[in-house]
Amino acid sequence: MADEEIRQKALAFIEALGGSDNIKEIEGCITRLRGTLADPAKVDVAKLSKLKIVGRPMLMGDGIQIVVGTHAELIGTEINNILRGQ
């Protein structure tokens, strides 16, 4: 996956997760994005589904896990770069 494609995917995940203010923490781990959200109700499951995730996102309290495939670590890193203004 090209750098620009990773960036666009990361931006789409940020939007689907309720925006940058809703993401407290996120990381990529092998095939999953794992994170903590300020308000899980802001997650747009329909938007996540359009991002070709595997199955449904798993919401547990304020935590979320999303199976995204082998690019999870790249996407997670890029989400964090965007959240830090890079």
Q: What is each model feature region?
A:
Residues 3-86:
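Membrane-embedded alpha-helical signal segments
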